[in-house]
Amino acid sequence: TGFILLYFSTKNLNFLSKILILLGTSVLVISFIVVGHSFSSGIYSQLLVIVHVICISYWVGSFLPLRHMCTINNCKNLHEVAHNFGVYAVIYISLLVITGLIFSYILLGGVSPLITSYYGNVLLIKISLVSIILAIGAINKFKIVPNIKVNQIDGKNKLKSSIEIEIILTFFVLLLTSILTTSLTTPLGV
């Protein structure tokens, strides 16, 4: 339902479209808390998941537009857009990591189940992949994006390649997330 509302809302960007985008986004976010472990873990966990999903949406949702900007010849504002993205990303990626760690701790009931349970092992792989994506993002922010100002062609090609790697790794993170959410029981039996 959420995707359908989002699809129709992009036809015209008037007031109704903005309402449909908000409604569609809300339906998508709520769907994450009514299916999976957060539903059984209480309202605090559900709020963590809502913040987590919103932050993921901002982060991952930027990949394709930024990648597209890298394919445009003589894209004059790529440096500015990528730089501003990096500034805001610090905020929502921090929230993403904090909410993810707290929610993981709630689901695991401690740190040791990361090593001693199958659920924890899969979660540890997911955390490792996210750490790699964060490292790539840091390289983008501090090395590649500043290079765009000096050498736009080289900088935008490197940023495009870097974003493509992030997209591939994100696919695997989302795959692991779906396995953790729907197929595995937490060490606490949730």
Where are these regions (language model features)?
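Polytopic transmembrane helical bundles with strong interfacial aromatic enrichment
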Residues: T1-V190
